[in-house]
Design a protein with these regions (language model features):
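Alpha-helical subdomain
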Residues: 2-158
């Protein structure tokens, strides 16, 4: 039996179970622009169509002025690899992936309220690689980061 840490809310952390395309979940957040807000979404947007992601990001940028959204993404070429290796490899035949980011700067064009769009390396950008991963694995990690096959994107709203 596996034991998982419970997701608990605190004064600074709040979890919402919802349909992201129904933006009524915005109303569940006691948001004050002077306090700021950061949204983290890991492994989420791959499964959304680009038009749905654009609508969501635009609505978030307008509603959460002064906030930030941090999420992971891949290039279009990376989606094909993801579909082939991850999803089909685990026999997830009914699942598809759609959303990718080839040029992070195009995200700013979606809304005048997106003031900054920055791409950071996914595997090497926040923690240095070390010997425990092995030589070949470190080379693969560096390639994935340099090619933007894996990236962490930060959007700032104003």
């Amino acid at each position: 039996m596996k034991t998982f840490l419970p997701l608990t809310s605190s004064d600074m952390t709040f979890y919402i179970a919802c349909d992201l395309n129904d933006i009524s979940w915005f109303d569940q957040i006691d948001f004050h622009p002077e306090d700021g807000i950061v949204f983290f979404a890991s492994g989420v947007f791959y499964y959304f169509k680009k038009t749905d992601v654009e609508k969501l990001f635009t609505a978030m940028a307008e509603h959460f002025t002064g906030g930030k959204l941090v999420f992971d993404a891949t290039k279009k070429k990376g989606l094909k690899s993801m579909l082939k290796t991850w999803l089909k490899g685990f026999e997830m035949k009914d699942i598809n992936v759609y959303f990718s980011v080839d040029d992070v700067h195009t995200l700013k064009e979606w809304s005048g309220h997106i003031s900054s769009a920055v791409s950071n390396p996914y595997l090497t950008g926040y923690r240095p690689l070390d010997k425990r991963y092995g030589f070949i694995t470190n080379i693969v990690f560096r390639y994935l980061d340099r090619s933007k096959m894996c990236q962490i994107i930060e959007l700032e709203f104003d």
